[in-house]
Regions:
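Conserved ABC ATPase "signature" region
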Residues: 12-30, 139-140
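Conserved ABC ATPase signature
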Residues: 35-39, 43
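Hydrophobic anchor residue at the start of the ABC signature
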Residues: 49, 77
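Conserved catalytic motifs of ABC-family nucleotide-binding domains
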Residues: 56
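A short, surface-exposed alpha-helical micro-motif characterized by mixed small hydrophobic
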Residues: 102-104
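ABC ATPase "signature
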Residues: 120-121
Length: 161
């Protein structure tokens, strides 16, 4: 609860801050009285983001924040996180297996294998000039929406074998 972060906050002030938090993530104050089972997965995630931002953190940790969401709401949440990161000058640790999302959101990437860091660096460098074989294999396994590029990747893989 908010009073653990702001013990001197009045109920009215807390109510206003909560409403502002919901509005910031694109929800209305109508959501205040709803139970989790009355919300969609995307709405639950938006409420979770609003709650995480209430104490005005300098660091936001997002662990698979969009992995279980439909593509349409996933894009909205990604855009929201990018906006929040920029507007609030927030440091964000974004944990994900979806490399397309990682590439869109992250400035720096850490690649882990069996719980150990195998490579790290600026996102574009890691994605386009991986230094470790594990990272290169991981990136080459990502499906490419363009069938011609997917075919090129397949040919390169089979020629390397």
């Amino acid at each position: 609860p908010l009073d653990s972060f702001f013990p001197s906050m009045t109920k009215e002030s807390a109510q206003k801050d909560i409403e502002d938090g919901l509005i910031e993530v694109g929800l209305t104050s109508d959501y205040l009285g709803r139970y989790p089972h009355e919300l969609s997965g995307g709405q639950c995630q938006l409420v979770a983001i609003a709650r995480a931002l209430m104490p005005k953190p300098q660091l936001l940790i997002c662990d698979e924040a969009v992995s279980a969401l439909d593509a349409s709401i996933r894009g909205e949440i990604i855009d929201l996180l990018l906006r929040i990161k920029s507007e609030k000058k927030l440091t964000m640790i974004f944990i994900a297996h979806d490399l397309a999302v990682v590439r869109k959101i992250c400035d720096r990437v850490i690649v882990m294998q069996s719980g150990k860091i195998v490579e790290q660096g600026p996102t574009e460098k890691v994605f386009f000039e991986p230094e470790k074989e594990y990272t290169a294999n991981l990136l080459s396994a990502v499906p490419v929406p363009d069938p011609r590029k997917e075919k090129e990747k397949y040919i390169q893989r089979t020629q390397a074998e």
